[in-house]
Amino acid sequence: MSFRREKFIEFGGPDGGNGGNGGSVIFVASSAVNTLLYFRYNQHIRAENGKAGSGKGKFGAAGRNRVVEVPVGTQLYDEDGNTLIADLNNIGQQYTVAAGGRGGIGNAQYKSSTNRAPTYFTYGTLGEEHCVLLKLKIVSDVGIIGMPNAGKSSLLSRCTASKTKVSDYPFTTLEPHLGVAYANGCELVLADIPGLIENASSGAGLGHKFLKHIERCVILLHLVDCSLPDIVSAYELVRQELKLHSQELAGKQEVVILNKCDLLSEGEVREKQKLLESSTKKEVITLSMGDELDSLIVFLHAQVKKAVVTEPSDTSFDPFLYVHYNKK
């Protein structure tokens, strides 16, 4: 509230200006970041307050928005983690997490023919304050799936420069790993998904935690260990878990590879290849440790281009993190 006070002006009248609106907290999906690590150390995010109005009818400046870049594939849930608020799938997509408050109204705005000197004004409103849960799903061109010890991490390491842990025991991979493969001008992002076991769709093994990451892959690369006594059952077990998780996941395009063929004779490999092709009704590729992979990368790149790409492939795995956003 303010009144004009100048020499020789007896009845200056009200001249209090309005306050500025507060800034908002806005999330923008960006390819410049690929983890949620920033929020581990910045759990409270505030935008700038609006400035107060002043005399001579001066309006206060609006507060600057706080724009925070997040990886493509970031999902925002309510505090309980049950309700999806926003899904930032595309570069440049944005969501206002907490809107800024409205500025107050100065007494000059209440001047009228019946009230030439109003002595009242309106306070501004508080900005929004929210506590949300961030989740990040892997987004890749090719998701490498299969049972534990099928050779997924070894294949990723050979195709890319990804330094994933490789050992001869189940569940060596405890979190998804990404790698970028290059061959003959083709670029491909591959994700090594931890092995799936029976009842993975119900949370057994590492299932529940990582089945959701496969949803963001364009196509699936299904590895089957050639040395297993029953390769058909091994293949069908993984397929069944995909179906139980979601029909959308089970309907993704799939390339089947019979891996570790160097452990068997050529005759045994051909026999198992025919058996698996007969069961899956798909062409099965055989792969040994010493095989060159450029042709495989080019082939997978062509399959990705044919598939309907609905999501970008430019992010990485990160644990779920609680982040508290507020602006007052």
UniProtKB/Swiss-Prot annotation:
Domain of life: Bacteria
Binding site for Mg(2+): 153, 173
Protein's UniProt keywords contain Endoplasmic reticulum: no
Keyword set includes Metal-binding: yes
Residue stretches making up the Obg domain: 1-139
Domain OBG-type G residue range list: 140-309
A Pfam match: GTP1_OBG
Localization per record: Cytoplasm
Main location: cytoplasm
Cofactor(s) demanded: Mg(2+)
Keywords: Cytoplasm, GTP-binding, Hydrolase, Magnesium, Metal-binding, Nucleotide-binding
Recorded family membership: Belongs to the TRAFAC class OBG-HflX-like GTPase superfamily. OBG GTPase family.
PANTHER family referenced in this protein's UniProt entry, alphabetically: DEVELOPMENTALLY REGULATED GTP-BINDING PROTEIN-RELATED (PTHR11702), MITOCHONDRIAL RIBOSOME-ASSOCIATED GTPASE 2 (PTHR11702:SF31)
Assembly and interaction partners: Monomer.
Main function: An essential GTPase which binds GTP, GDP and possibly (p)ppGpp with moderate affinity, with high nucleotide exchange rates and a fairly low GTP hydrolysis rate. Plays a role in control of the cell cycle, stress response, ribosome biogenesis and in those bacteria that undergo differentiation, in morphogenesis control.
Protein name per Swiss-Prot or TrEMBL: GTPase Obg 2
Organism (species): Anaplasma marginale (strain St. Maries)
